[in-house]
Amino acid sequence: MSKVIGIDLGTTNSCVAVVEGGKPVVITNAEGERTTPSVVAFTKDGERLVGGAAKRQIATNSGRTVSSIKRYMGSDHRVHIDGRDLTPQEISAMILTKIRRDAESYLGEPVTEAVITVPAYFDDSQRKATQDAGRIAGLNVLRIINEPTAAAVAYGLDNEAPQKILVYDLGGGTFDVSIIEIEDGTFTVLATGGDTHLGGDDFDERIVEWAVAEFRRSDRIDLTKDPAAMGRLKEEAEKAKKELSSALSAQLNLPFIAVGKDGPHHLDLSLGRPQFEMMTGDLLARTVQPVQNALRDAGISASQLGKVLLVGGSTRMPAVERQVLELLGCEPSHTLNPDECVAMGAAVQGGLLQGGGKLAGATGAAAQGLVLMDVTPLTLSIETLGGVATPLITRNSMIPTRKSQIFTTARPMQTSVEINVLQGERHFARDNKSLGKFKLTGIRSGFSSKPQIEVTFDIDVNGVVKVSAKDLGTGREQNITITGSTNLSENEIQRAMADAAAYEEEDTRRRERLELHNQAEMLAYKVDEALSKCKKELDKDEKNRVRNDLASLRRCLRKDKPEKMNETEEANLRQAKSQLEASANHLMVLYSTEQDAGRQ
């Protein structure tokens, strides 16, 4: 049975982990890094880059590079590339595919199952979009787990004392806060809140806006009109933000950022930490209300918290730690790596699912079995007469859960009713998000009696919603899993899966061609060196044969570019390489013997 991996699919960076010996272990990617940038790029040659390779070329290829796609999950946003409109699910699937392949390389076996994390405040359509992305990437998503819950699991694995903890999760694009009670191996989420459009990206953007304004004032040039310049500036802004976490000032230095009538212009600015904190103070202030709401909903005060965990790379900013200390009156814990703990918790959840609730190889409570009890972050309602949003399941209700309520039609003789399913906290339907609509038809009508329609909401362990409506008079029932206009249909998912498989096959072919090209270059170099050292030991015919075959291989190498190589060119290169290997076999044996003798 293949292992279940845990994936933190982040806005700016993603991380993957697996349980080994009862403990979660972070898997390094092909580049040797423990996190992978959530960036996808398409080169003009048609090559697809994912991760670090994609991020490194943002400045020169900004129009064909996609980052922070997580912010658009569950929306109708599209990325237009080479005549195709790619959905956020498809872009996310490209990131997940790289993560899956890196995990397969580490484990030495196929990976088909995963637990993927999402912000606690993700709504139904965003959760479904994440599931769809996993499917497109060739993964069976066993569970969608909230990021703060995953972090709490990673913490609680080695801290079994009964306690209530607050997880403050400020990532690249989202903010979450959850209050979780840990006791006897049970993790119970008491309350959750957040903002799905607040994160490190917003702090970067403030630096970019400031730098653009400063450069416009000093050099009279508007950098926003140059995509390449903006790409470089965004990269430099992120770097400056990170520097300001440990230094009191950071330098933004971009030579030749623009060209004016008087020649090239250079950007050279100094940003102090106090100025940065003043520029971004309102962003940080947006985290206060969700924290206070979560405490209120959980029915506890800050003094009852045993620990405050900081999660997400953005919590490294000193201002975050100061605000948490002022707000909650306790020093935040630095027990966890904020970039890795979410993936580690997801891996533990995967191990529990695979082990029937127990973690193989673990000790303590984890060996006996861990239980996760999460909540739904937003109220679920239906639209009733007058455009009112009538709640059926309130936010912070434990999941899985099921709730029914009986309604009647608005008018006599009405034979059908449209059910508008809503998610949000506002009183009127128009102010909440509509997850989808469906019709119940064939209702028994009459002037003397009012039909009774039972509406049932069902939320599964992934936080995904199913709705049914039943006419109690006729027994007629309509069941649906909510699929709003922003979700993909089954046909669209199947098409995207086929496209992803084709992409993966093409990526494999590109790698094989690059490897062939590199091997051929290395062979040509070694044969050339061997000829210079051992030519006196070869007869004239053998020497000419080797030289001719070496020349043929070099002609192929000069003509062929690995990224543009077609099948004919690949076949010619492969044949030329094989031919040289055969003709130079005797030479290489002589060369190897001579080298061995020289070492002795």
Predicted region positions:
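Oxyanion-binding/catalytic loops of NTP- or PPi-dependent enzymes
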Residues: 1-75, 79-85, 94, 101-600
